[in-house]
């Protein structure tokens, strides 16, 4: 079974947002660049189903403020379910709403972009917490992408991945949360009470990938999977980048693609094709090499700021050419975090704005992150319920971190979210490990 969506031009921007005085004074100088930062998107989807547990979310015309075109953005998600489709469907239907709820509605565009990484962490945890009240056995990977102008923010758990090609170079915007890919994640789970190892067979031999027992899940992070253990956390890896005015192409695919194709092969086999045909070609290339052993899904998004040229540039630069021009620039502490300064960076590089993959919730919600006033004093930072003055529990309640963190510093959690945080950190072990001779979840 295959599914497709038409590749149609979609505007991904709106009217001008409020800008600082410094930008207004230089508007004449940068008018061309400002126009180029309202990109056009072309989107393609192709999927071949084996179990019917892959779900996608394509919404190119979102508005964070309903009825305000200047607040427009686009959102795309891929949810690769396992042990049933419940977690994938629930996450698809609720994640974006939870992200928007976690960000104050009155933020300007600059602060909205700065708040997104932390809001996505809160939304992933809330979605997981809410779903686990409804089901125990289902789980899902999540790769969720928000595009606002030339800014791309990606949050991911599991092994579905998002890769960017821009300016002739390839950038990985998500993490692989399989145990085989990270000793750090193996150590975290075992220290929290999980048993990580390979499947035992008759004679004592161990086969297959590293898995967490009980349950046999090969992922250290997902949404759902309550039956495996709370140390399988929904805290996402988040990366935010800003494209140059040349635009780029995103490939978002499930492991059915990445288990067979490298990012280079995926881009090479589809470079001359529009998004719909590119997504189909990538899936068919993967299936042809390995057969249809799993649901195999691909989303391709072309970001085209130059409306005079609706075709992606297809000439890949030769290695060694333009090394500094094509470097993946990461902001340093000396760089201003203001949107004003970001507007005037070298336009020929992909700039890394934010990256964090820590699995510990207290660190991901830390008050040192941008937008210090994002979390209100009497609102739970995760589920957004109102708290009485005596009810809030600081995320630093049990912190042993050095510095000026104090137990009465925010952000604050309600009792239920505090218990969720403790469980994810291994402070509330709900079950003992069981034998590795059982079946596996994924």
Swiss-Prot record:
Q: Which residues bind Mn(2+) 1?
A: 80-81
Bias (Basic and acidic residues) occurs at 420-434
As cofactor, the record names: Mg(2+); Mn(2+)
Sorted alphabetically, the Gene Ontology BP terms of this entry are: regulation of intracellular signal transduction
Look at the named UniProt entry and state the broad enzyme category this protein falls under.
hydrolase
Spans through the membrane: none
Print the keywords alphabetically: Hydrolase, Magnesium, Manganese, Metal-binding, Protein phosphatase
What InterPro entries does the database record attribute to this sequence? PP2C, PPM-type-like_dom_sf, PPM-type_phosphatase-like_dom
Query: Which Gene3D superfamilies does this chain map to?
Result: PPM-type phosphatase domain (3.60.40.10)
GO terms (molecular function) for this protein are: metal ion binding; protein serine/threonine phosphatase activity
Question: Where does this protein hold Mn(2+) 2?
Answer: 80, 255, 294
Instruction: Kindly state which reaction or reactions the protein catalyses.
Output: O-phospho-L-seryl-[protein] + H2O = L-seryl-[protein] + phosphate; O-phospho-L-threonyl-[protein] + H2O = L-threonyl-[protein] + phosphate
Using the record's annotation, list all stretches that form the PPM-type phosphatase domain. Answer: 35-303
Span list, region Disordered:
420-442
Q: How is the cofactor bound?
A: Binds 2 magnesium or manganese ions per subunit.
Q: What is its EC number?
A: 3.1.3.16
The family database entries (Pfam families) matched by this protein are listed as: PP2C
What family, per the record? Belongs to the PP2C family.
This chain's protein is named: Probable protein phosphatase 2C 15
